[in-house]
Curated annotation (Swiss-Prot):
Predominant place of localization: cytoplasm
Protein name as annotated: Galactose mutarotase
Family: Belongs to the aldose epimerase family.
Tree of life domain: Eukaryota
PROSITE patterns with a match to the protein in the record: ALDOSE_1_EPIMERASE (PS00545)
Catalytic center residues: 176 (proton donor), 307 (proton acceptor)
Amino acid sequence: MVSVTRSVFGDLPSGAGTVEKFQLQSDQLRVDIISWGCTITALEVKDRQGRASDVVLGFAELKEYLQKHPYFGAVVGRVANRIAKGTFTLDGKEYKLAINNGPNSLHGGVRGFDKVLWTPRVLSNGIEFSRVSPDGEEGYPGELKVWVTYTLDGGELVVNYRAQASQTTPVNLTNHSYFNLAGQGSPNIYDHEVTIEADAFLPVDETLIPTGEIAPVQGTAFDLRKPVELGKHLQEFHINGFDHNFCLKRSKEKQFCARVHHAGSGRVLEVYTTQPGIQFYTGNFLDGTLKGKTGAVYPKHSGFCLETQNWPNAVNQPHFPPVLLKPGEEYNHTTWFVFSVA
């Protein structure tokens, strides 16, 4: 049984609408999601003693989500991740996007899908959000109808993304939740044990755009096929953290891609997806300046993201998995976040 409770989270300035909160509860999980950016604001998971803690970074109030923040919990699009120099060419026409991350376009631009109000529809076991992204929004071609559905089933949070386009456009949707399985507000994620089921990753340039090479993980810091304790692993390889796409099988079938275990609490997160990639990000740009829920501060490496996705900058790399959605087709991807204790 899943209960869905609806409440007001806050009002947007200048009468631009009311943001609602939807609380989904199963016997194992409780998830709060708001209609601003389809954002997960809280996710309570029990530890091995049966004590529940909120394991996602975020804020208590709407005003904080309206200020600049690193996409805590939000759905990002029309194209998640980076597009080099904010440009791409389709059918001989060059499109110029908003530049909002160094020389590149990141997560859909200045006002991406994380910074808009979505229309909610309550389901028996979750919530569906929808919106229409108009032709030309943030420089992208064509009107795009989008649906994001969150459902609960026991210890599983399932996120489904669907989209239909009026003209050919790149589409790549993901959720940008930051997790800390010790509980949000814990100072770091160094004691988390991470596994990523990927034989290859994408090396990046200094602006975090993939170079185009598909590199084997074997013998590198990116070989996470067997569990590694994150803090020790970063030290051993002298790296600042991860912010890279790991290459999964291009099957479109549900596949296991990542597992994170926090030994102290016993909490385990496993991720399954139909997507061909997953961005593992270790909160390298968090700096402790943002004040989160319950007075928490979020310093560097205090949360991790597992963003299932198409490969970054795929629109400019013909040998990457196809990212273009054509009229008459449907974009349809699902990601499963499965929580348990061990």
